């Protein structure tokens, strides 16, 4: 495989709370990215059907919550199949952020779809952030395996403030990704109204740079744009976050933290491209490898519980006793 990889990072606005229309727009963006030579295209957090921005204005909105459930994406669905088909037809890796509907419970999810259209992995955000917990559930243990081999290199993904979870980050670093997709909702410049700098466009850019430096990977920082249509659709006027048009700040960072892309204005939609040389990772690895030569696992190590705890499961002792009785 060549060390040269062309990537595309979207900065776009979904068709808010409309599953089918946003799936169509997803495919349009995939086609556009592939036509411009990209081998991988990245989409933001909850790109389908759009991030539920109203949660930062009011914690309960039964009408919108019901609509959101009905328009969230099921993995085994015609809509997902159409995205897979589009990826295969255009021979491009797709890293998709979406609200996953699993038996009408929702999860902040990501899928990595290979250039042959096969889903290589799906994962759920391990813990929804703050008000997101009014909509979304926690992940399962198998979601820790978030890095896979693709035709564009070894690719991994996390969502939003998962990028400030030290243990989760280290576990992801240990899976040896070359390209990392950092998926975010709309992000806005910091102001002095008491909001957290770490939730601003500047703060999250710093988080992306840090991730690149710590992991020695290329980071594709992808964000959503919210226009007036989104503000009106979700009635976020006067809310704490996402109450005005904007939010776009997509970027691409190299494995030493330098920015490799030029920004698109925050209210504008577009795709950012960069030609990556994966061999540049060696330059950073020569100095630091936090899961290799620059580590001390004899002193500090990470424990992981990666099994899936089902909602309904048999007690092991009971199963063994029943089996013994049947043998008698």
From Swiss-Prot:
Its EC number is 3.5.5.1, 3.5.5.5. Residues 5-278 form the CN hydrolase domain. The keyword Ribonucleoprotein does not apply. It is an enzyme of class 3 (hydrolase). Coiled coil: none annotated. The active site is at residues 45, 125, 160. SUPFAM superfamilies: Carbon-nitrogen hydrolase (SSF56317). It comes from the Eukaryota. It catalyses: a nitrile + 2 H2O = a carboxylate + NH4(+); 4-chlorophenylacetonitrile + 2 H2O = 4-chlorophenylacetate + NH4(+). Keywords: Hydrolase. It holds the Pfam family CN_hydrolase. GO terms for molecular function: arylacetonitrilase activity; hydro-lyase activity. Belongs to the carbon-nitrogen hydrolase superfamily. Nitrilase family. Nitrilase that hydrolyzes preferentially phenylacetonitrile and (R,S)-mandelonitrile. Also acts on dinitriles like phenylenediacetonitriles (PDAs) 1,2-PDA, 1,3-PDA, and 1,4-PDA, and cyanophenyl acetonitriles (CPAs) 2-CPA and 4-CPA. This is Arylacetonitrilase. It comes from Aspergillus kawachii (strain NBRC 4308) (White koji mold). The lineage of its organism: Eukaryota, Fungi, Dikarya, Ascomycota, Pezizomycotina.
């Amino acid at each position: 495989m060549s060390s040269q990889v062309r990537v595309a990072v979207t900065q776009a606005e979904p068709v808010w709370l409309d599953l089918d229309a946003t799936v169509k727009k997803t495919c349009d963006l995939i086609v556009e990215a592939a036509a411009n030579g990209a081998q991988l295209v990245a989409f933001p957090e909850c790109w389908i059907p759009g991030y539920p921005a109203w949660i930062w204005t009011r914690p309960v909105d039964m009408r919108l919550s019901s609509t959101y459930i009905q328009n969230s994406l099921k993995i085994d669905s015609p809509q997902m199949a159409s995205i897979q088909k589009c990826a295969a037809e255009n021979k491009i890796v797709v890293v998709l952020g979406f609200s996953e509907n699993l038996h009408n419970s929702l999860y902040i999810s990501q899928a990595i779809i290979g250039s042959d259209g096969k889903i290589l992995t799906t994962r759920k955000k391990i813990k929804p952030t703050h008000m997101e917990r009014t909509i979304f559930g926690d992940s399962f243990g198998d979601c820790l395996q978030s890095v896979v081999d693709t035709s564009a290199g070894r690719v991994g993904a996390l969502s939003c403030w998962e990028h400030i979870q030290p243990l989760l980050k280290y576990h992801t670093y240990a899976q040896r990704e070359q390209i990392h997709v950092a998926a975010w909702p709309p992000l806005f410049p910091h102001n002095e109204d008491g909001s957290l700098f770490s939730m601003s466009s500047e703060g999250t850019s710093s988080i992306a740079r840090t991730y690149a430096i710590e992991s020695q990977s290329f980071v594709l920082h992808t964000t959503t744009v919210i226009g007036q249509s989104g503000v009106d659709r979700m009635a976020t006027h006067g809310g704490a976050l996402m109450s005005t048009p904007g939010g776009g700040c997509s970027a691409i960072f190299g494995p030493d933290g330098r920015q490799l892309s030029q920004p698109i204005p925050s209210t504008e939609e577009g795709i950012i491209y960069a030609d990556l040389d994966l061999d540049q990772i060696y330059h950073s690895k020569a100095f630091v490898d936090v899961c290799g030569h620059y580590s001390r696992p004899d002193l500090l190590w990470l424990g992981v519980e990666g099994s899936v705890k089902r909602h309904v499961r048999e007690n092991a002792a009971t199963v063994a006793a029943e089996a013994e009785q049947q043998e008698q």
